[in-house]
Amino acid sequence: MKAILASSLGGQIKVDGKRIPTKLMENNGLLDTIRSCWKADSKVMIISGSPSFYDKNDSVESCMKESFSLSGLSFTEFLMCDERNKEIIARIPEMDVVILAGGHVPSQNVFLKELQLKERLQHWNGLLIAWSAGSMNCAETVYAGPELPGEAVDPDYRRWISGLGITRTNIFPHFEDLKEEILDGMRLIEDITYADSIGHEIIALNNGSYILINEDSTETIYGEAYSILDGKLTRIGSDNVQFLDLII
């Protein structure tokens, strides 16, 4: 299996609250990388990051189908798996591409466990693409940082949960967009994420940055990214640079 774990895939803009399809992001060669791994006339399944939000899922499915076509990625089937049709997960062996959508990390994590996706991917040899929450849930141990009001101050909120085990890297997406974010009266980065990084490295990706995982488990990070470890932020790469190879 190959995997492309992105902060964002792009593929849409919002106009008056409506999703308008566009080509996928081309920053740091993201679209070229997807094309190089893409099988012509693929069968594709998106697994929702908001499994009970059906209107949103229908909108994402419709938009991404057109976006992939605009991006020169051909397919014969394009499915959205959410709470309405969990049974289609049995078709994973037929799929050439599985996409893990963005959404709420803990909600998607529960859904992935219901689907037994980790077990289903053990002997699957297709292309896995993920963005945002989907990328975060690919970790062996997922950093599910607080994101909704109340989560940062909830003593029962679990910030570390088991994931799909595709990588040991903990991804923090949309970094540049969240630098000024305030949650429950605290700075999301400095007060919350830095504290959670004690003893745990978190890799922060800007939109347009991504990690490519090859069949031999080597991981290459493309684009601007940062290491957050023990409360310290270290820049580890720049746009248009392939800068880090890890063997996990």
Label the model's feature ranges:
Residues 60-63, 112-117, 186-188:
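Charged helix-capping and loop-helix junction motifs
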Residues 1-97, 248:
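N-terminal beta1-alpha1 cap of cysteine-dependent amidohydrolase-like domains
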Residues 1-40, 144, 148-248:
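C-terminal and late-domain segments of enzyme folds
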Residues 91, 114-126:
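Catalytic-core regions built around general acid/base machinery
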Residues 101, 122-141:
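Catalytic nucleophile loop
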Residues 5, 97-101, 129-130, 170-171:
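Structural motif
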Residues 105-114, 182:
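Glycine/threonine-rich flexible loop motifs
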